[in-house]
UniProtKB/Swiss-Prot annotation:
The glycine cleavage system catalyzes the degradation of glycine. The P protein binds the alpha-amino group of glycine through its pyridoxal phosphate cofactor; CO(2) is released and the remaining methylamine moiety is then transferred to the lipoamide cofactor of the H protein. Belongs to the GcvP family. N-terminal subunit subfamily. Pfam families: GDC-P. The keyword Phosphoprotein does not apply. The lineage of its organism: Archaea, Methanobacteriati, Methanobacteriota, Thermococci, Thermococcales. The glycine cleavage system is composed of four proteins: P, T, L and H. In this organism, the P 'protein' is a heterodimer of two subunits. Its EC number is 1.4.4.2. GO terms for biological process: glycine decarboxylation via glycine cleavage system; nucleoside metabolic process. This is Probable glycine dehydrogenase (decarboxylating) subunit 1. Transmembrane segments: none annotated. It comes from Thermococcus onnurineus (strain NA1). The gene is gcvPA. Keywords: Oxidoreductase. It comes from the Archaea. The keyword Oxidoreductase applies.
Amino acid sequence: MGKHYLPNSAHKDEMLKKIGFNSIEDLFSDVPKGMVKEFNLPEGRSEYEVFLELNEVLSKNKTVLEMPSFLGAGTYFHYIPAHVKYLIERSEFLTAYTPYQPEISQGMLQALFEYQSLIAELVGLPIVNSSMYDWGTAMAEAALMSARVTRKNKFVVPEHMSPEKKKVLHTYTAGPGLEIEYVNWNERGQLDLEELKEKVEGAAGVYVEMPNFFGILEEEIRAIGEIAHDAGALFVVGVDPTILGIVEAPGELGADIVVGEAAYFGNPMNFGGPRAGIFAVRDDKKLIRQMPGRIIGMTKDADGKRAFVMTLQTREQHIRRAKATSNICSNEALVAVAAAIHLASLGPRGLRELGEVILKNTAYLKKRLSEVAEIPFEGVNFKDVLVRFEKSYEEIHEVLLERNIHGGFYLKPHFPELGESALFAATETTRKEWVDALIEALREVA
């Protein structure tokens, strides 16, 4: 016997009547018939059947533990302590809710305040926002901010920079019409200071990375900052924060703005995201007022107790769009909290040990790679090592994949002048036997 109350279409009929239609077909009558398609969905399956099919598809993926990867070039395999995931999956943190109401968001706001405090200590600058989308967007926002502060219309960056970062920078600066000036590298794979001096005039900001895209530590960071400041430009440093346990903080090297990637702490590679961009400035009212994103501040409530709030909310949801410093609609709060938990767990000693192990593993990788290919640039490498081959690297890479090894990042499509070159990377997770297996495979094919 049919159930006359299923389905119940009364609410649908009421809504159609309210807007002047008799049926769903009438509502969409203006859509050309040729554009209306049948779904042609297959027969439904049980949840278990769907589980089996998806599991079969997912089993085709290989993790970096099953297939050692030397890919690098911006995304790296770091070990994440088990408690990080447990803590960020707590319902107090794992939410899409923006903490607009501080009276019910003290836990999240305090966690983000701790993130800001940790990053401030790490980069050597006192004012930090609660994150950007990623390193690339943070760098692009720094370019726009430099132009606003100095009222100049040129931003100087290294030619040897991630192709993805270049695309993001051009996307951000095309609308405002900010000119991007590129400076080449010298014979050591570092920024050419003489060319920088020629191109810095009229610049709003000068950007440099530590380490640079080739994995090399720029030896003249302080001198680059002096050249920028002598020209009246802001000095912007992009940093991989995992190196900051073993080198001087960029704020102590003269940086006005520091950007970087916080997601290297506490967050998996996950196909490249999500990320959390670091954004820090020195204690200057002009810079603070022009910062993009959110800043979490500590204050006192009506009862005189400590409280955390969002402060200087110069974003488009709070003020007129044209007046906003940035149109970033949200930050990467959960990613930033994960980074803060990991950083707090490491502490100063753990951070130093992390940097030392990465440096040691990179040096071993570089030494072994020099046995089978050319290392065109001298200097100290951190994580990435640029290697040049005589044969086609695309062919070499295919053979490595057959040997269950994921090789380096192919550079020729982005830097043709470097020939058949690639970036190979190591982190604290890179095992000696992985490197040895890579070299044995390269001996046969390179």
